[in-house]
Curated annotation (Swiss-Prot):
GO terms for cellular component: 6-phosphofructokinase complex. It catalyses: beta-D-fructose 6-phosphate + ATP = beta-D-fructose 1,6-bisphosphate + ADP + H(+). GO terms for molecular function: 6-phosphofructokinase activity; AMP binding; ATP binding; fructose-6-phosphate binding; identical protein binding; metal ion binding; monosaccharide binding. Its cofactor is Mg(2+). It comes from Yersinia pestis (strain Pestoides F). It is an enzyme of class 2 (transferase). The gene is pfkA. Pfam families: PFK (PF00365). One of its GO terms (biological process) is fructose 6-phosphate metabolic process. This is ATP-dependent 6-phosphofructokinase. The keyword Magnesium applies. The keyword Metal-binding applies. Pathway: Carbohydrate degradation; glycolysis; D-glyceraldehyde 3-phosphate and glycerone phosphate from D-glucose: step 3/4.
């Protein structure tokens, strides 16, 4: 059984990460474990920037966005020599367990620490993209969804006033879940996501069909990286004759106080991660990652969840079918 654990946040930040850290710290202290907070993810682990946390370290953190430990992208962690330094830093402090909050890249780093250094690592899915396998939802997804829907509502006000077409670019990397959920909740007329082949002419045809039915304005939700938004807006305006404007929501989607569901999910996952570390699991095959499936906490080997065939969450085809029916 572990006696000292570390906790870090890695990669892009997500609302609810502080709640997850709090869940880990409070659950670990209740079990008599020492907890170290590692600053700025794997970079801080390499630079030996760790601090012992107590109950008061996480007081008033559950409602705060971002991550008070800080986060960073640290591609140098792929270097085995860099990982050796990180492992040395943990071993010198007697840290034998680690909770990593982040996406699949963060999971990969945790798995290597387990396989190379014997550290018992558990990953928690912290990303607004909802693109991590092994879980129905990631920490931060529902807060980002609220942010996107609020933006869509505001754009609808001005689009309807000017009989304008608005294109909204939503984060998600190579996963369309955030765009899809926002399109349904925001009543978007059209949607473009990575899981479904996107062609400009098909989108224009749908918009023209809407205009023919008397539609005077429209909202198009599109996942980032699918097209250049300004160029697409000009193309739609040229083909339809309707004024068209693009809006890139950007990093505002990552900020803000986490909504209640994200706070609950993060707290449950944090406590569950500590339970895993306290149990007699076999870590010879690597670390574990936590998920929620049908509202129940589950875990799986990290190696399974980051395997190429499982590297992202399953496409919510039923959501897409629903969205299409409502256009």
């Amino acid at each position: 059984m572990v006696k000292k654990i570390g906790v870090l946040t890695s990669g892009g930040d997500a609302p609810g990460m502080n709640a997850a850290i709090r869940g880990v710290v409070r659950a670990a202290l209740s079990a008599g474990l020492d907890v170290f907070g590692i600053e700025d993810g794997y970079l801080g682990l390499y630079e030996n920037r760790m601090k012992k946390l107590d109950r008061y370290s996480v007081s008033d953190m559950i409602n705060r966005g971002g991550t008070f430990l800080g986060s960073a992208r640290f591609p140098e962690f792929r270097d085995p020599e860099v990982r050796k330094v990180a492992l040395k830093n943990m071993h010198e402090r007697g840290i034998d367990g680690l909770v990593v909050i982040g996406g699949d890249g963060s999971y990969a780093g945790a798995d290597l620490l387990t396989k190379e250094g014997g550290i018992h690592c558990v990953g928690l899915p912290g990303t607004i993209d909802n693109d991590v396998a092994g879980t129905d939802y990631t920490i931060g997804f529902f807060t980002a969804l609220e942010t996107v829907v609020e933006a869509i509502d505001r754009l609808r006000d001005t689009s309807s006033s000017h009989q304008r077409i608005s294109i909204v670019e939503v984060m998600g990397r190579y996963c369309g879940d955030l765009t899809l959920a926002a399109a349904i909740a925001g009543g978007c007329e059209f949607i473009a996501i990575p899981e479904v082949e996107f062609k400009r002419d098909d989108l224009v045809a749908e918009i023209k069909a809407g205009i023919a039915k008397g539609k005077k304005h429209a909202i198009v939700a599109i996942t980032e990286k699918l097209d250049d938004i300004d160029s697409l807006a000009k193309y739609i305006e040229k083909e339809t004759g309707r004024e068209t404007r693009g809006t890139v929501l950007g990093h505002i989607q990552r900020g803000g106080a986490p909504v209640a569901y994200d706070r609950i999910l993060a707290s449950r996952m944090g406590a569950y991660a500590v339970d895993l570390l306290l149990q007699d699991h076999d870590y010879k095959k690597g670390g574990f990652c936590v998920g929620v499936q049908n509202e129940k906490m589950v875990h799986e080997l990290i190696s399974v969840c980051i395997a190429p065939e499982n590297k992202k969450s399953k496409f919510k085809e039923d959501w897409y079918d629903t969205a299409k029916k409502l256009f």
